């Protein structure tokens, strides 16, 4: 009932981002801008020498993706999914924006604060690394318990 008929398609009319100080890429430039976005991200990841540099590249590219704002709706969700995708592609614990960090994340985006986005990304990736380590430990404990039975 509330499903848009243009879901999954590039925008055809200008859009705005509420609370943001930037103007999204015009529709006629979306495809070219996305091509440049991917090239720049992949180059930055190739040049990165550490996990932190990779997270920095991913978070900065997220800001660029949100500036392109290629769809009429769902750009935030797609952008955050791309953060997770590129973290996994680079074997980095994914940056998952939790509810408790939403305001900080939105403020960093709206203020175009690359440093804050990087710090948030590093912090959340580390939190996810610890969570994964705990889960692996719990699985091992359970498997040991099953073997002893």
Predicted regions and their residues:
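FIC/Doc superfamily catalytic core
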Residues: 1-149
């Amino acid at each position: 009932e509330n499903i848009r008929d243009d879901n999954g398609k590039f925008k055809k009319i200008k859009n705005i981002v509420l609370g943001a100080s930037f103007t999204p890429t015009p529709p006629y430039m979306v495809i070219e801008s996305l091509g440049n976005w991917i090239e720049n991200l992949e180059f930055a990841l190739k040049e990165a020498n550490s996990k932190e540099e990779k997270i920095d590249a991913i978070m900065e590219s997220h800001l660029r993706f949100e500036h392109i704002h290629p769809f009429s709706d769902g750009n935030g969700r797609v952008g955050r999914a791309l953060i997770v995708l590129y973290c996994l592609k680079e074997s980095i614990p994914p940056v998952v924006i939790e509810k408790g960090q939403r305001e900080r994340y939105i403020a960093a985006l709206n203020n175009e604060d690359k440093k804050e986005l990087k710090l948030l990304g590093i912090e959340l990736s580390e939190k996810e690394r610890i969570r994964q380590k705990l889960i692996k430990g719990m699985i091992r404990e359970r498997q040991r318990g099953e073997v002893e039975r």
